[in-house]
């Protein structure tokens, strides 16, 4: 029943149709496009990290519009190659994945951040229980936020998508302590 409803929504979704026409892998591209049109956080020559990248539409947009940008993407799921994107398939929360990022980004304990933008569209496998799904996503967001604090240059940008729920306000409060605009 739910998969039939999803198929129906996809068939009637103008963003799904637009993504197909414009060559984006998913409708999610328009979320990052809309945010960038409002806040202008991407520029050519930046270093961008895309966590939870599959199927790749956020990285695809950045690579397409800002071709001189270095993009490092990571996801548990494989993505088809995107010109200008270095991809790692693995669990962002694992030591191995973090070592890969540290190496690619030249991050050490003694360096300041080297990244201009960290974006996270990570989502857990959902179980259908809203509170549980929300809490699982908040754990992933906290990992992404902690990484952003270490990896971002001064004045860098952290972009994250979240399910709404009870734990959101606490994380937003923490983020506001470190970023000017939230």
Task: Give the positions of each predicted feature.
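Class I SAM-dependent methyltransferase Rossmann-like catalytic core
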Residues: 1-46
């Amino acid at each position: 029943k739910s998969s039939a409803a999803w198929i129906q929504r996809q068939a009637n979704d103008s963003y799904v149709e637009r993504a197909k026409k414009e060559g984006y892998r998913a409708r999610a591209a328009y979320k990052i496009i809309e945010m960038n049109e409002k806040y202008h956080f991407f520029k050519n020559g930046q270093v961008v990290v895309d966590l939870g990248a599959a199927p790749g539409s956020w990285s695809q947009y950045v690579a397409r519009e800002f071709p001189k940008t270095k993009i490092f993407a990571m996801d548990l799921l494989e993505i088809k190659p995107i010109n200008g994107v270095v991809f790692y398939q693995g669990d962002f929360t694992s030591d191995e994945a973090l070592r890969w990022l540290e190496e690619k980004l030249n991050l050490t304990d003694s360096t300041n951040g080297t990244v201009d933008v960290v974006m996270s569209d990570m989502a857990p496998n959902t179980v259908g229980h809203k509170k549980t799904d929300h809490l699982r996503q908040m754990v992933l967001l906290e990992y992404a936020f902690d990484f952003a604090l270490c990896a971002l240059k001064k004045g860098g940008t952290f972009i994250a998508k979240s399910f709404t729920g009870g734990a959101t306000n606490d994380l937003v409060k923490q983020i506001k302590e470190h970023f000017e605009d939230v």
